[in-house]
Amino acid sequence: MALDPADLPDDVRGFLTERHLATLTTMRPDGTPHVVAVGFTWDDEAGLVRVITGGASRKVAHVLAGSPRAVVAQVDRARWLSLEGVPVVSRDPERVAEAVRRYALRYRQPADNPQRVVLEITVDRVLGRA
């Protein structure tokens, strides 16, 4: 079922706060999908998915090489969501700190990583049911 990212139902927003891992799909330069497990956070006000990662990761390289879209998919039994949108990589210390803060609230405090960046996906399509 397609959902409006700007007006998600309460059960969907609740599902996005539960402690689950997800998959992140980016596109390799040859057009094939690269799928990895990630922790992520959802910013309902900004319509953003945030994924913290090392600056030298393949997912970052794919986005910097022009991966036009990214998808984060979270599944828990019969509940599932796919959040699709346009990815960007930010090295801005304030944006990275905000992503780390949100990650720590949902999962745990991540280890220090001076090379950390944040992958931000502006979500324009949500599919699923929670």
Regions found by a protein language model. Name each.
Residues 19-55, 69-72, 83:
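Short beta-strand segments
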Residues 1-7, 77-130:
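Charged, gly/pro-rich active-site loop segments
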Residues 1-22:
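Short, basic/aromatic recognition patches
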Residues 15, 31, 42, 74-76, ...:
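Sterically constrained small-residue positions within well-ordered secondary structures
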Residues 11, 23-27, 106-112:
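Short helix-to-loop capping/linker segments positioned immediately adjacent to catalytic or ligand/cofactor-binding
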